[in-house]
Every structure is written in C-alpha cells, then in structure tokens.
Amino acid sequence: MSSQKTIESTTPNLPTPYYLIDEQAIVNNLTIIKRICDLSGAKALLALKCFATWGVFDAMKPYLHGTTSSSLNEVRLGAEKFGGETHAYSVAYAEHEIYDVVSHADKFVFNCFSQLNVFRHVADDKGIAIGLRVNPITS
C-alpha cells in the first residue's frame, strides 16, 4: 500500500466542489518568469481573464509587476487585491464604465483608432499611459 497521502485523507470534511491550488508549483513557475524579466528587462503581468483567484495573489505578487484586465471588475480586482501596475484593455467599453476603468488603471490600451479617438481624453485627463493594439491585417 502506498504511503502517499490523498486529498481525501488529508481533508475529509472539506465541502465540494472546491479548488485545490498548488502554490508551490505556481511559485516555481513564477520564479522562472521573474528570472527572465530580471535578465531581459521585460515586465510580466497576470492576465486576470485567465486566473483571478485572489486567494493566492499574495504568493504571486513578489514575482509579477501587476495585472492586465479586460473588464471593469477585473481592473478593480487588480488594483484593489493585487497592486502593482494595472493595465486595462478591452475590445469594447461602455461609455458609462470608461471613467471607472481609467480611475483604477495605470495604463489603458485601446483596441482600435476609433476607440482611441472617442476615449483618449479620458485617459489624458487622468494622466495615465496609453497604448494602441494594432493588427495590421484586420484593423
């Protein structure tokens, strides 16, 4: 019989479903990413669209420069729970959301020239850096 512990044997009363996250595996991967950043001068951001489990943000913060977000709620989560740089990007923003998004962001990346033309003044008024996503084939 194996002496290896199973999840069931170590956490028999945990309600299900639940997420089991191996923080050490995350830290191991982030250590590699941080080393690449240190050697290259690049910055690494956590994309909240793919991983927004704020319960492990404290373990991740030392290795990343901040977050990138594609909605108002993600921008707020990054600013309030992760810290560091907060980048905002979305293919579309509702006009009533744009002021809230910009109030939580350090950088705003516009999806197209028309979005830039309509909302640039909001980012400029806030004094945050801006960017423009360019897709030469379809933009």
Functional labels for PLM-detected ranges:
Residues 29-39, 77:
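A short, N-terminal amphipathic alpha-helix
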Residues 28-29, 135:
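Asparagine-centered polar/low-complexity signal
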Residues 18, 42-139:
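Active-site-proximal beta-alpha core segment in soluble small-molecule metabolic enzymes
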Residues 5, 9, 30-32, 50:
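Short, flexible segments with low predicted structural confidence
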Residues 25:
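Active-site anion-handling motifs in enzyme catalytic cores
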Residues 8-10, 36, 59, 98-99:
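Short hydrophobic/aromatic segments of transmembrane alpha-helices and their interfaces
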Residues 1-21:
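Generic N-terminal amphipathic, Lys/Arg-enriched alpha-helix
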